[in-house]
């Protein structure tokens, strides 16, 4: 394998290895050996910015956090990727996310490069005033490095609509102009319709296409038992869409535990969870405070300290939608396969460990089909790209127009992953389900590599 020499950055190393392995295990480098020259260049960020964020808490004391922005690759357009506020944030995680973002954005077909940023600040338990002051301090350091045609951040874990508002307001005051420099904005000040639900809906759309393709259109979501992790935006909207089309959602989770349901979680429960999560409540607190809603015919069981993968019996579909590496290899991936799961699509970035992915790929011959995050959860960034286009024109498209454009992007994205998986397959038995993992990596890499050759970054 082409090495990058960064074993001290495990998250980034996994993302790098996944891409390079997919390319080396295909016929791409045999047919087009010049593409090998791109790997050492594309795997190093164009720029990494690290800065101090000093801010005042409610006691009048100064607190300090580490802020970052990884501007990874701009060959296809301005750097584009979210901001994450979470105590786990470090450079390895942001480099992994930024690296993935390059290729995820490439699959949308929109003019966006790849980047990621954030801070090790934890918004949980903080007052609204503290979060506002922190956002202003963070933007004071970041503002000089971003712009509508340079770098357009968005939200991520710990950065929702409230935080985007504070960040945008701070940027506007500092720069004395109104640019579409952030996406995920409010609908009355430059946001796009369908943005909040896009990632969850599109993860669902990818699964829908997988089921249709694998069964030649004979099966749909109706009656399928779907195991979801997470309980944030992605999981909430994916759950509602699954239920709408006749599927049965059997689990949700958060950092403290999981809820599982034999008969299926209902929309009223999802909406209650969504409202409570805005107040940073745990699933345990929510189920205890709303006993009537979560008992009786629609009862759920709360399981403390565990993920849901091996806890619900038989199910057909898995949608990891919480955070990175939430499906492990030896135990959880094998448990998914043994429970009858046939379709796995990552609503989160790097939702599965390398060992878990190996289990899924090894079982493609048993009709187990896996879609990586860059192919399955690019709906959010696709609508972010559409929000950038609307901001440039100073217009707001209707929900129907955004939805139509998003569906076209996602169907094209699926085909763009499916076709190269077959075209560049080096597998002896290529009659079964093609590897969407390899297809997504090949298709996105070719697009980025061609742009880098054209622009003289590689020659």
Curated annotation (Swiss-Prot):
Active site: 116
Any single Pfam family the record assigns to this protein: ELFV_dehydrog
Any Gene Ontology biological process: glutamate biosynthetic process
EC number: 1.4.1.4
SUPFAM superfamilies for this protein: Aminoacid dehydrogenase-like, N-terminal domain, NAD(P)-binding Rossmann-fold domains
SMART domains in the record: ELFV_dehydrog
Disulfide bonds: none
The organism's place on the tree of life at top rank: Eukaryota
Entry's Gene Ontology molecular function annotations: glutamate dehydrogenase (NADP+) activity
Catalytic activity: L-glutamate + NADP(+) + H2O = 2-oxoglutarate + NH4(+) + NADPH + H(+)
Entry keywords, A to Z: NADP, Oxidoreductase
InterPro entries: Aminoacid_DH-like_N_sf, Glu/Leu/Phe/Val/Trp_DH, Glu/Leu/Phe/Val/Trp_DH_C, Glu/Leu/Phe/Val/Trp_DH_dimer, Glu/Leu/Phe/Val_DH_AS, Glu_DH, Glu_Leu_Phe_Val_DH, NAD(P)-bd_dom_sf
GO cellular component, as recorded: cytosol
Enzyme class: oxidoreductase
Quaternary structure, from the entry: Homohexamer.
Similarity annotation: Belongs to the Glu/Leu/Phe/Val dehydrogenases family.
Protein name: NADP-specific glutamate dehydrogenase
Organism: Schwanniomyces occidentalis
Gene expressing this chain: GDHA
């Amino acid at each position: 394998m082409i090495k990058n020499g960064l074993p001290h950055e495990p998250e980034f190393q996994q993302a790098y290895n996944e891409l390079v392995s997919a390319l080396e295990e295909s016929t791409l480098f045999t047919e087009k050996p010049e593409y090998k020259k791109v790997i050492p260049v594309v795997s190093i960020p164009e720029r990494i910015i690290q800065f101090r964020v000093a801010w005042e808490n409610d006691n009048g004391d100064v607190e300090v956090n580490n802020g970052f922005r990884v501007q990874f690759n701009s060959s296809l357009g301005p750097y584009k990727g979210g901001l994450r506020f979470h105590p786990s944030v470090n450079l390895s995680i942001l480099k992994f996310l930024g690296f993935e973002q390059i290729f995820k954005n490439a699959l949308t077909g929109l003019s966006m490069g790849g980047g990621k940023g954030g801070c090790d600040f934890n918004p949980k338990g903080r007052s609204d005033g503290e979060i506002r002051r922190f956002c202003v301090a963070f933007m004071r350091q970041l503002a000089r490095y971003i712009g509508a045609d340079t770098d357009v951040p968005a939200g991520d874990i710990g950065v929702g609509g409230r935080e985007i508002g504070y960040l945008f307001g701070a940027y506007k005051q500092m720069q004395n102009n109104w640019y579409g420099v952030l996406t995920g904005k409010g609908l009355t000040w430059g946001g796009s319709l369908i943005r909040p639900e896009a990632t969850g809906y599109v993860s669902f759309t990818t699964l829908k296409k997988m089921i249709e393709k694998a069964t030649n259109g004979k099966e749909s979501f109706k009656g399928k038992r779907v195991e979801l992790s997470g309980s944030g935006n992605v999981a909430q909207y994916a759950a509602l869409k699954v239920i709408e089309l006749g599927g049965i959602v059997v689990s949700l989770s958060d950092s403290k535990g999981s809820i599982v349901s034999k008969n299926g979680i209902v929309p009223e429960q999802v909406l209650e969870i969504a409202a409570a999560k805005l107040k940073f409540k745990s699933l345990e607190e929510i189920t205890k405070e709303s006993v009537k809603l979560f008992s009786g015919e629609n009862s759920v069981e709360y399981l403390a300290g565990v993920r849901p993968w091996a806890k619900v019996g038989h199910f057909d579909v898995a949608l990891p939608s919480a955070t990175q590496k939430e499906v492990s290899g030896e135990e959880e991936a094998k448990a998914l396969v043994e429970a009858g799961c046939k379709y796995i699509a990552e609503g989160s970035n790097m939702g599965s460990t390398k060992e878990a992915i190996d289990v899924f790929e090894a079982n493609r011959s048993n009709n187990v089909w896996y879609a990586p995050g860059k192919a399955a959860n690019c709906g959010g960034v696709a609508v972010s790209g559409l929000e950038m286009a609307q901001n440039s024109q100073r217009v707001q498209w209707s929900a129907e127009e955004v939805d139509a454009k998003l569906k076209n992007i996602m169907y094209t994205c699926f085909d763009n992953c499916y076709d190269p998986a077959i075209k560049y397959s080096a597998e002896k038995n290529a009659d079964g389900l093609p590897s969407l993992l390899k297809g997504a990596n090949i298709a996105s890499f070719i697009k980025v590599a061609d742009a880098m050759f054209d622009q003289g970054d590689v020659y």
